[in-house]
Every structure is written in structure tokens, then in C-alpha cells.
Amino acid sequence: MKAELIAVGTEILTGQIVNTNAQFLSEKMAELGIDVYFQTAVGDNEERLLSVITTASQRSDLVILCGGLGPTKDDLTKQTLAKYLRKDLVYDEQACQKLDDFFAKRKPSSRTPNNERQAQVIEGSIPLPNKTGLAVGGFITVDGISYVVLPGPPSELKSMVNEELVPLLSKQYSTLYSKVLRFFGVGESQLVTVLSDFIENQTDPTIAPYAKTGEVTLRLSTKTENQALADKKLGQLEAQLLSRKTLEGQPLADVFYGYGEDNSLARETFELLVKYDKTITAAESLTAGLFQSTLASFPGASQVFNGGFVAYSMEEKAKMLGLPLEELKSHGVVSAYTAEGMAEQARLLTGADIGVSLTGVAGPDMLEEQPAGTVFIGLATQNKVESIKVLISGQSRLDVRYIATLHAFNMVRKTLLKLENLL
């Protein structure tokens, strides 16, 4: 199946906004086994939009239009598609009720006739409810070509796609099942090298590597009759892949940390803290609270995290954490001594089960004769205080801080698994 994405909005063409919807939709279509062959952007102009729809209908099986569903006169997507399909626009009862409920809570005068446009759908289409906005989407098939209209705001589009469109397309078209494996501690080029025979000779299942900042994912996909068969095929391939070793001789299983497109090292670590009923604190220097803010972003974070420290200067490290200033000056802030002292003092001061620390050189300049990207991460438990040195080279200051935070989460994750004898 060939799909085409059409982004509608003059603001995209003028560079006022970035078309992040195209990337999101392309990923979702890939998960469903639907190939996106074309991406088009067109302004808020009926004639040009008609031309784009006509072209898409001649070369694609699935045409997805994003944007132009709002209440203003330049929101023309549904109206133009209806004109092309020679269909009427009708009102969706559920969308009308949502409009009524929305404006019932506001001044009656704030509701104008053009608001009603958001509740319209193309006659004969399947409405796609909008959980986070007012403009209803839709799905319709005419003469063997399927058309989808989606709202432009990314928060509305993502919700509609995940909750409405993906289940609908899954029933109609797809028998593709996927599993995403996540790795930290190995680069994409090395991963592709050690798995080159699998990747070069792949048929079904397929293997698709993706590089992200600081980590790599592998998407394993298979077309089969049901989930049980897919699980068997993907599970067998996964076992074969994880049995391979990196160029340094480390099993890939050691750098594999979890599953899922939307998963993360931070989430895995947070869930382990909750599972094993452990509390954590952090003392941060170069990351300036990034570890703590990431951890606090998860609902229920207060179960495992009560607070921590951000101490940038040597003097603040001494004052906030009670570390001897002369010893700090002797060893330097970019050192194992400082990292271990920060982690242990943070743990003792808060009473947490685990203390973690990050200190180092974010860059771009050297510090204490250490190059940019040099990071020491400390970790303290009741039984042990340790640290690791990480060199994050060739990265921006922002990425050094982000990747350092990933290393800290990974260190905590591995410690938790060791405590439970799972690693």
C-alpha cells in the first residue's frame, strides 16, 4: 500500500512552524506496514489544494491530509476534499455535542456560526473523534482510495492518530507486527556491523536500526496471521540478535535495556525504583538538575524521590553537601573523589537508599585540564560507593549534559538489577 501525506497550511510553507506531524505519521505508518511514498505541503488555497489531492489520488492508495479543520475561512481541507469527492458535508452528532458542552461553560456570545464548521464531516465518512480539541477528523474510501483528514495541532493529531486512526487502519489493512528493542552503550554503526549478516539477508522478519541521541533502537517487524505467531517469530530473532557480541566482546544483551517506541532509560529506572521500593536522591553539577527534573516528570515520582541538590561551584558543593573544601580543591571537581563524595553525602543528608551524582565538563572549553565531555558519575548505596568516568566526545554542551544523564540512569538501573540479582 502506498500512502501520501499532505500538510495543509501556509504557515508551513513560510517557515513559521515545523512540520513535525509528517515525521510522526511516517513512523506510525511504518509500524502498520504502510509505505509512505510522498509528502506534500500546500498553502490555504482551494485551487492548489484540489490540484494536490488530484495528484495524490492518482498515485496513492491512502491520502492523509493534516490541518485546515478549524473554524476560520482559510480552513478549507474538509470543504475542498468534499468538493473533490463530490460529497456533501454533514454534521457529526458527537462533535456537535462537544461544541455545545464546550461553549456552555463560556459566554454564549463567544460562540459564532463559523465554530460549527469544526463539527462537520464528509458524508459517508467514519468520524474520528477529537479528544483534545473541537475539530472532528474523518476517514472515507471512494473508488478504492482511502482519505483521512486530521487536525493540524500536533497534540490533537497525535491523540487522534493513536486512539482512532491506528486501530482503524490496523483492522482494514495491516498484518504487520513490530517489536522495538532499545540499546544504550553501543553506537548505531557498531550495532549494524555486528548484525550485518542479519540486516543484509533480512526477509521476514525485517530489522530496522534507528539512531537517537545517546542510544539506538532496532525495530523488528513481521507480517503474519496473528499476534501469537508474531511473538514467536520476533522472539526467536531477538534471542539470536542479543546473543551477538560488540566489537569489544560484550554481549549485546548487556547493552539492551528495554522494549517500546516510547520507552526510555529514565522510565525503566523509575519503574525499577518503584518495583523494588527504593528511594533515590541526586547531587548534580554539570547537568544542573536534569537528572532530577527527568525523574520528576513521571507521575508518582514522589514515591521514590523526595529531593536533591544542584551545586555548580566548588564552594557550593562544600556548603550544600558538607564536603571538605580543601579536599575538593586538591582533587578538583572533575574527579572520582568529588563524584563519590557528592553521591554519598546526598544519600546521607536525605536518607535515600541510593545517591547518584554528576560532575564534569559540559564544554566547550576544558576544565582542570580535562577535555569537554569528561564526566564522573558517582553512586552510593548503604553497602558501596563507586564512580565511573565517561568521555562524551564530539557533542554539543546540551548533548553532553543529556547523554551524561542517560549514563547516570543506566548506572542506577544496573545497580538495582544487581541488588535483586537480575544482572
Curated annotation (Swiss-Prot):
It comes from the Bacteria. SMART domains: MoCF_biosynth. Gene3D superfamilies: 3.30.70.2860, CinA-like (3.90.950.20), MoaB/Mog-like domain (3.40.980.10). It holds the Pfam family CinA. InterPro entries: CinA, CinA-like_C, CinA_C, CinA_KH, Competence-induced_CinA, MoaB/Mog-like_dom_sf, MoaB/Mog_dom. Signal peptide: none annotated. SUPFAM superfamilies: CinA-like, Molybdenum cofactor biosynthesis proteins. Transmembrane segments: none annotated. PANTHER family: NICOTINAMIDE-NUCLEOTIDE AMIDOHYDROLASE PNCC (PTHR13939), NMN AMIDOHYDROLASE-LIKE PROTEIN YFAY (PTHR13939:SF0). Belongs to the CinA family. This is Putative competence-damage inducible protein. It comes from Streptococcus pyogenes serotype M5 (strain Manfredo).
